[in-house]
Curated annotation (Swiss-Prot):
The RNAP catalytic core consists of 2 alpha, 1 beta, 1 beta' and 1 omega subunit. When a sigma factor is associated with the core the holoenzyme is formed, which can initiate transcription. One of its GO terms (cellular component) is DNA-directed RNA polymerase complex. It catalyses: RNA(n) + a ribonucleoside 5'-triphosphate = RNA(n+1) + diphosphate. Pfam families: RNA_pol_Rpb6. This is DNA-directed RNA polymerase subunit omega. Keywords: DNA-directed RNA polymerase, Nucleotidyltransferase, Transcription, Transferase.
């Protein structure tokens, strides 16, 4: 049961926030930091694993891994943090490692 008023209210409602994660930073900007999309996947996955291990070791009192080098958002996932670090250029990447 739709009415013209209901449709007008639906069309004028504010849109949802833009999605975060792999769309921010843009993939094209990230590819400028590495040689290929495959290198980007490996590079970001390794860094995300380090960030995840860092958070896991905090409770144990160990400091073997380096934490996030950019300010993480609330409940931001390690892969999103790693991609933002790559985009910001705070990591040095060498091919083959």
């Amino acid at each position: 049961m739709s009415t013209p008023n209901a449709l007008a209210a639906f069309n004028s409602s504010p849109s949802l926030n833009a999605p975060e994660g792999i769309t921010n930073p843009p993939i094209d900007d990230l590819l400028e930091q590495v040689s290929s999309k495959y290198a980007l996947v490996i590079y970001s996955a390794k860094r995300a694993r380090q960030i995840n291990d860092y958070y896991a070791q905090l409770g144990e009192g160990l400091l073997e891994y380096v934490g996030p080098l950019v300010e993480p958002g609330p409940r931001e996932k390690p892969l999103s943090i790693a991609l933002r670090e790559i985009h910001a250029g705070v990591l040095e990447h060498t091919e083959g490692e």
